[in-house]
Amino acid sequence: GVSALSLSLARAYCGKILHHGIVNNVKIVRVFRKGMARYEQRLMDEHLEILDGETAELKHQFVDDNRMTFGQFTDKHNNYASREAALLLDAEFHLTGSQIVSQDHGKEVERKRAQKNRYAKMPLFWRAFGYFVYRYIIKLGFLDGKEGFLWDFLQGWWYRTLVDAKIFEIKRACGNDKKKICQYLK
């Protein structure tokens, strides 16, 4: 039977629903039967794992209407950037010795993880710039006006550059010494 319901995600930023860039056609599970789902154990970007049953897709949208001030956004993403830098360093240097067990989380989740793995192998700083160009120019984010620019710039370039700056800072202080990197991250 049906254990979970998925919806199409729509993003709003600065009070405007964004229609371009990379915000469309993402399916997310937000409703599920008690005991039939659990969140993955990850530092960030956790996904819901459906333990048993089918997932039905609703025709309605879930609107992620971000109402944070720019100060709140900056604080939140600074914290996220530290965690993402740690995850990327772990992937590069195998710091924790843990290995992510591949499970079927759905095509969307697996596709996004494959994209993140490709992104992680690109050169620092250039990848953030390229990601912004992809979102804002190629995927037509500029058609969403000032709100689209702010979303793509802050979330797509500024945040990604901050992650790379944190990685750069750690590598500058520690080199490629796994032990030093682990100490730095504590």
Locations of regions flagged by a protein language model:
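C-terminal-biased regions
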Residues: 176-177, 186
